[in-house]
Regions:
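A cytosolic small-molecule/anion-sensing beta-strand core signal
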Residues: 71-72, 88, 106
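A short, N-terminal "cap"/entry segment at the start of jelly-roll beta-barrel domains
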Residues: 1-48, 128-131, 139-149
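Double-stranded beta-helix
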Residues: 105-149
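Conserved short histidine dyad/triad with adjacent acidic residue
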Residues: 42-62
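A generic "binding-loop/recognition-motif" signal
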Residues: 55, 63-64, 82, 98, ...
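Short acidic-glycine-tyrosine-enriched beta hairpin
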Residues: 79-99
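Glycine- and acidic-residue-biased ligand/ion/polar-headgroup-sensing regions
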Residues: 63-81
Length: 149
């Protein structure tokens, strides 16, 4: 496992930097639909996402603690401590308020694991993440109509 920590990042402005990246991407990048698998079991929700190489994804703000796992591949990911390059497998413990940007240097598979009360993808989206009216993804990582315009 290889981990490289970025230097010169302040904890507070990281979410602002990720939001600025999302705003810039919305104007200049064509979104892709992500191969996403959803599993519910015993009050837990697991989301597994395949990220093709040279792809950058900006997620929504998470409301609850959860695990974020890089199963395979190499990604550069933003955390509260800054940007870091990780080759999977690697496990992060994410706090409420986390908003990540993830750049896949290689094909990568990442997953999140959450404790939930919900039993559907639509319900879990409402339970786990803040509403983002600018997001081009519907629950389950399906592209919305605005992504295609």
């Amino acid at each position: 496992m290889q981990v490289t920590y970025g230097k010169g990042f302040d904890v507070a402005p990281m979410s602002n930097r990720v939001q600025a990246l999302q705003d810039a991407m919305f104007a200049h990048v064509t979104p892709i639909e992500l191969d996403t698998k959803h599993r519910f079991h015993g009050g837990m929700y697991l989301r597994e996402v395949f990220r093709p190489a040279d792809c950058i994804i900006v997620g929504k703000v998470h409301k609850k603690e959860h695990f974020y796992i890089v199963l395979s591949g190499t990604v550069v990911i933003t955390t509260d401590e800054g940007a870091m390059e990780v080759t999977g497998p690697h496990i992060f413990e994410s706090k409420p308020g986390a908003k990540r940007a993830v750049y896949a240097k290689t094909d990568a598979v990442c997953m999140t694991i959450h404790r939930v009360d919900s039993t559907t993808v639509e319900e879990v989206e409402e339970e786990l993440v803040e509403n983002d009216p600018d997001c081009v993804y519907l629950p389950g990582n399906k592209l919305s109509g605005k992504a295609l315009t």
